[in-house]
Structure formats: C-alpha cells, structure tokens
Regions:
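Nucleotidyltransferase catalytic core that binds NTPs
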Residues: 21, 25-181
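Conserved post-catalytic alpha-helical subdomain immediately downstream of the catalytic base
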Residues: 1-26
C-alpha cells in the first residue's frame, strides 16, 4: 500500500523522480479528504472569503436555517437561493440553537453531519455554523448582496434585511416542512 502511494506521488512529477515521506503523507491525506470539507468554513474564513469574492465582483447570496432533516423542499429552496447570485453561503444553526428553536430531541443530525451533507449539495458553495439565537452578526460580517428566506417570512421582519442589498422570499414546497416535527 505504501509503495502504491509513493507511485501515486512520483507519476505526478516530470521525468525521473522520487517521493519524500512528507509528499506521500500529504498525498494520502488528500485521498481521504472530502471536497465537502473544503466548503465548511469558520467565521474568520467566511469573512475573508466574502471579502475576496466581493473584490472579484461576485454576487453573494446568504440564507440560514437548521436543515435538520434534509428533504426535497430544502434542496429546491437552496437551488432557488443560489440562482439569485454567484455564491451561496449558508449559515447553519448549531446543535444548541436548533434545540432552543425546535425543542428537546432536536436536532436529529449533528451540526457537523448537517454541514457535511449541505456542503455536498451543488447549490451550496459554503457552510458556516453559527451558535447565536439569530444570524444577525453573521449577516453583518458577511454583508451579502442578497438575503434569502422562506416564504413563511412574508409580511414579517427578517433578521438582517437591513444589511443585505436585497431580500428574496422563496415559497416552500407543499408538504415538505419538518418544522413542526
């Protein structure tokens, strides 16, 4: 197995070459790393990334939620959210905040499992977990161009709408909400 890893490093080089132990270890690590991991960011990382994206004239879309029991309605919602800009950043409620919002016994899936699944979706570019009761501070830090929420927010005050340039409300898919379960 070690020889195969070393061969994997060497074939990527030009001409006759050798592989150092560090190169082999790094190569093995890259084989075991999921691309989803690269899309889950810390607050500091997402702030730096959003600044960089804006400098490249990318339109940033932000949404947030618990996304505890992922279903087709969530996927459609996220696909629609992504269509409003170039990059979709999803603020994911921490386990503590999901319990506070939905009650004991929730979340069903841990914050890391939820983040991993969401980051694997084509529509979601980045996931950042937040522990506050609302995403206001996160939205303030990112300063998205577009803030997206579900259609159930129609006629209601949306946290962070004073920060984003634009607010979009997306209708839910009938029969697909797990908010009351």
């Amino acid at each position: 197995e070690f020889a195969n890893l070393a061969a994997g490093v060497v074939v990527g080089k030009i001409g006759s070459a050798t592989a150092t132990l560090n190169e082999i270890i790094e190569y093995e690590s890259s084989l075991n790393k999921s691309t989803s991991d690269e899309h889950i960011k810390t607050l500091d990382e997402i702030i730096a990334l959003s600044t960089e994206l804006k400098a490249r004239d990318k339109k940033i879309v932000f949404t947030n939620g618990c996304f505890d029991i992922l279903h087709a309605g969530h996927v459609r919602y996220l696909e629609t959210a992504k269509s409003y800009g170039d990059v979709l950043i999803l603020g994911l409620n921490s386990d503590r905040s999901v319990t506070a919002l939905k009650g004991e016994g929730r979340p069903i899936n841990t914050q890391l499992d939820r983040a991993y699944i969401l980051a694997a979706l084509e529509a979601v570019d980045y996931v950042v977990i937040f522990d506050e009761d609302t995403p206001y501070d996160l939205i303030k830090a990112i300063k998205p161009h577009v803030l997206v929420k579900g259609g159930d927010y129609k006629g209601k005050e949306v946290v962070g709408q004073d920060i984003a340039d634009e607010l979009k409300l997306v209708q839910f898919v009938d029969g697909k909400s797990t908010t009351k379960t």
